[in-house]
Curated annotation (Swiss-Prot):
Its EC number is 3.1.3.11. Belongs to the FBPase class 3 family. InterPro entries: FBPtase_class3, Metallo-depent_PP-like. Keywords: Carbohydrate metabolism, Hydrolase, Manganese. Pfam families: FBPase_2. The gene is fbp. One of its GO terms (molecular function) is fructose 1,6-bisphosphate 1-phosphatase activity. This is Fructose-1,6-bisphosphatase class 3. Pathway: Carbohydrate biosynthesis; gluconeogenesis.
Amino acid sequence: MENIDMKYLHLLAKQYPTIAKTATEIINLEAIMNLPKGTEHFLSDVHGEYSAFEQVLRNGSGVVKRKIRDIFGDELDDAEINSLSTLIYYPEEKMDLIAEEMDDMHDWYRTTLFRLIELCQYVASKYTRSKVRKAMPEDFAYILEELLHENYNEEDKKMYYEEILQHIISLDRAAEFISALSRLIQQLVVDHLHIVGDVYDRGPYPDKIMDTLMNYHSLDFQWGNHDILWMGAASGSRVCAANVIRISARYLNLDILEDSYGISLRPLALFADEIYKNDPCTYFQPKNEDNLNYSKAEITQIARMHKAISIIQFKLEGEIINRRKEFDMNHRLLLQMIDYKKGTIHLKGKDYQLLDTHFPTIDPNDPYKLTKEEKELIEKITASFKNCRRLQKHVQFLYSKGSMFLTYNGNLLYHGCIPLYEDGTFMEMKLRGENFSGRELLEQFEILTREAYVRKPGTKEKKYACDIVWYLWTGAVSSLFGKSEMTTFERYFIAEKETHKEEKNPYYKLRNEETICKQILEEFGLDGECGHIINGHTPVKEGKGESPIKANTKMLVIDGGFAKAYHKETTLAGYTLLYNSYGLQLVSHQPFTTKEDAIKNETDILSTRQVIEMEINRKRVRDTDIGKNLNEQATDLKMLLEAYRNGSLHENS
């Protein structure tokens, strides 16, 4: 007792003023700690593909269907299991289809309600009543609690529950009740969601994904390289805004800016039509990967916009490189390496012919200087990003729930990499005059990313932080990028593929080694023997023999593969991860078709499970980070109880 601060116990006594209340809370905490660990669900690299993301989120990477098989495997055939699964994923839409095929829904409602209640009882069994109650929709909370926490086999209660269900059906509330049960099941099968980066990129609906995540019951977020670009644009970074628009134009995805976020691109269109009106912009034709129906005139205008914003981007990047010598990026000052008369560029000791030599806004004597019109344009565009309420709401959520890395239940989560030298030591970078590496480097990157958003506009601190955010997108020591350089200019203007090459950081080779992974885990304060690294960012090319499980299971690469462009390379849609009380399971997914197909034909994403690590003893809440906090609370309360019993403190009944 000598080491316990009595002031703290006095404060604790205000919340627990009696022996009875203190003892009750200790019992409650011990009971919670003995419950099975909740299921963690890991997703990465969603890339704006809302339909596939929604399906994986609703089915819990196959957890819902597995729970149905646990309960009804001997009672229902595969078709019935698929039908019940689809109902839980999309209750309203599925019931609409069923209602079209049935004249009388009464018996179907009754059977379905009983099945859903039984399933809900099963998935709720690992939680406290209090937690389940909080997850229930308010309208049905009382009835749900009655139905979920009683035994149907007791004859004296059976009729009571039959009557409840009969009234739900007769009062025409069965559909709403089924929807409520379905959503409750979805919520209870996954206790916590980890998004290991990149909601944003080339996909059309990152905004819908963000809306969904903002309504999710429990999650965290590790920022990805594409997320950081949008965060930078929302923070007021001109170069990040230019990059966002360039990528959107390249992949025919300007609708996300104009329709979803209300960011007007009319000033850019007018500027591009004027400056590049006689330019075919051949090498800036957008990629129409989804065969979208655009007219020739629309494609021509988008190509002009694409080129216009690209040139502005290259100029802005040159400005940053020139003022931030510590970024060590002089080799990326490409506009000054062009011979504008010959139409060539001198790179790494060799001259290359440029594919496009029409640069009406570039002054060869001062190539990084924006024209008056370009400057006005990028200021307008950046202001639109800053003033977009919906984007600001989404970015604020990314800041509030996100981080550069996360340690959680003994595992280390990050999107890109931990920058390493060839010998496996941590790469250093100088930030604000001081060298950082490893964990400290990522912590500094996070601090500066937050400063970019909150610092006052016009200050040197704001400008520096915004420049760092851009560096995180493209820099050699960025933990989000993980390559030596980003050869965007070369891909547009030089035919020779040798100039397009981007050398990966040694990390991507070294992460196959168990000793390196253990070293990284220990750098972040985790147990190298028990912990795992959960990494996104790089698609796993299974067709070429790559495996998502590396370094004797220390490294798990879970690029979700949602981006359709990578499906040919990977031969599947990617991976997600589950971590429940029984251990770690990697889930591989086949490509998703459509939501309509999933509902009508009851097609789910075909998933294959691979057990990575099976627990000998089932993990309990006490074995988790939350459990450690609960255990500390219980220890403090036991000290308080002892103080009451030995007379150090007196009860206040």
